[in-house]
Amino acid sequence: KGQSCLYYSFGYFESIFLRLKGVPYAYEISDIAYGFPSFGKARPLLRAIDRNLVKNAQFTLLTSEGFKGFLNQPKARFIVQPNKVNRKIIGVERKPLNLKDDHFIFSFVGSIRYASMMRFARTIGKYFPQHEFHFHGVANVESTQKAIDDMMELYPNIKLFGDFKNPDDFEHIYNSVDVVVVTYGVESLNETILDPNKLYEGIFFCRPLIATKGTFLAEQIESYGCGISIDSSTEEAIRDSLRLLTIEQLNNISRKEYEIEREEVFDSMDNLSTLLEEICKKRKN
């Protein structure tokens, strides 16, 4: 009947199945399955179900502290395990910025699919010819790729470098840019409360980050002192914020990132392993 097993669920609907089956389960949440705008009216009901799932799980692993605040279930047993940097590159040398002139290379590293990132790049192209914007990654749909191609045709300071190998290419990528752009929008719930690995990559490579105000990521950046948050809803708002950026400000942020211990930003399974061992001992007894 499954009572002698601990099932590990990686999803919302899988956890519903295990809950109905009445077997012990652990629940991992890496995004909110009903966090997209199309779920708007049904979200209160789906959230109520989710709160019941985490309450009855042996434990719930969250990849963002922001999920914990959203679920607001004090009776649940949570463990927060953000997607941090792969330990494969833990020995890589960290190089703080030493900018000397008003030429900044802004970059987005990852799957290119966010309208807010495209807006940021377009703003650099249109208003800041002295700067550059680099895309490192692949567009997820043809229309996004066409939009990038159109921008590159209009603005020579926008560049696309394509796919990369994670984490092997990170040292080359991050050492070739100055600022990491993580201006995820606020249109989707998931974008508002996620804690992306780009935060920890930026910190490790001592590159200041720019996030969108009103997001959990912006709170994290403020807590670490590793960047700034802006209104990214329009090109004009982005332009006005970027005009205030200075060489000294970026260099100071980079030096502060360098002071953060590297262990702080790398993946560790210690907490999860300890918890699983504890649960297994209890079940044997």
Language-model features, listed with the residues they occupy:
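Short N-terminal targeting/anchoring amphipathic segment
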Residues: 1-14, 24-26
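Membrane-proximal helix-turn-helix segments that form the acceptor-binding/catalytic region
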Residues: 16-20, 27, 33, 41-62
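Donor nucleotide-sugar binding/catalytic pocket of nucleotide-sugar-dependent glycosyltransferases
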Residues: 34, 51-92, 111-114
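Conserved donor-binding/catalytic core segment of Leloir-type glycosyltransferases
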Residues: 61, 97-116, 120-125, 133-137
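Nucleotide-sugar-dependent
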Residues: 115-116, 166-173, 180-201, 211-219
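Nucleotide-activated donor-binding/catalytic signature segment of Leloir-type glycosyltransferases, i.e.
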Residues: 137, 145-176
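A charged, aromatic-enriched C-terminal amphipathic alpha-helix characteristic of glycosyltransferases
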Residues: 232-239, 247-281
